[in-house]
């Protein structure tokens, strides 16, 4: 099982406290796959919604593949369906309702030639939590420098 990282949402770990992660497949078209292989994709502005017990990713930007003839209506930031088991979707839905959590995309990667998206149940950090994270990171860097 080889995993090849395509893109990572770096701001997710800074803006959110990650509670649990899930691996989901994505419904894509042929030209979108080729564009993703060229790393012409961004998940920084993307978010995940659950509608009628189906899960979707919105605002994931997949640039148009330059050598493909495009179908009308195929937008770069269109809504794409995520593939998860019904039990997982229901479990996620229950946790969101109980604990006031959000679903965010963490990373996009290839696993055995299939594009997978790692999504996470997360809780938003407050401003003082972000400051604590920055201070903690700075002290760790300083200790490493002093250690060397």
UniProtKB/Swiss-Prot annotation:
A single cellular component GO annotation: cytosol
Transmembrane segments annotated in the record for this chain: none
GO MF term list: RNA binding
GO BP annotations listed: trans-translation
Keyword DNA damage: no
InterPro entries documented for this protein: SmpB (IPR023620), SsrA-bd_prot (IPR000037), SsrA-bd_prot_CS (IPR020081)
Location(s), subcellular: Cytoplasm
Alphabetized UniProt keyword annotations: Cytoplasm, RNA-binding
NCBIfam families hit by this protein: PRK05422.1, smpB
Homology family: Belongs to the SmpB family.
Cited function: Required for rescue of stalled ribosomes mediated by trans-translation. Binds to transfer-messenger RNA (tmRNA), required for stable association of tmRNA with ribosomes. tmRNA and SmpB together mimic tRNA shape, replacing the anticodon stem-loop with SmpB. tmRNA is encoded by the ssrA gene; the 2 termini fold to resemble tRNA(Ala) and it encodes a 'tag peptide', a short internal open reading frame. During trans-translation Ala-aminoacylated tmRNA acts like a tRNA, entering the A-site of stalled ribosomes, displacing the stalled mRNA.
Name of the protein in question: SsrA-binding protein
Organism of provenance: Mycoplasma capricolum subsp. capricolum (strain California kid / ATCC 27343 / NCTC 10154)
Organism ancestry: Bacteria, Bacillati, Mycoplasmatota, Mollicutes, Mycoplasmataceae
């Amino acid at each position: 099982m080889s995993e090849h990282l395509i893109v990572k949402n770096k701001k997710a770990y800074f803006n959110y406290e990650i509670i649990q992660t899930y691996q989901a497949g994505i419904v894509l078209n042929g030209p979108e796959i080729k564009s993703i292989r060229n790393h012409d994709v961004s998940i920084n502005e993307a978010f995940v919604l659950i509608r009628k017990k189906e899960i979707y990713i919105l605002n994931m930007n997949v640039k148009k593949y330059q050598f493909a003839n495009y179908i009308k209506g195929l937008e770069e930031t269109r809504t794409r369906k995520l593939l998860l088991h019904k039990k997982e979707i229901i479990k996620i839905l229950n946790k969101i309702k109980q604990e006031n959590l959000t679903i965010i995309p963490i990373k996009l990667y290839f696993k055995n030639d299939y594009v997978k998206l790692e999504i996470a149940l997360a809780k938003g950090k407050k401003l003082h939590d972000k400051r604590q994270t920055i201070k903690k990171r700075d002290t760790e860097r300083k200790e490493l420098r002093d250690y060397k």
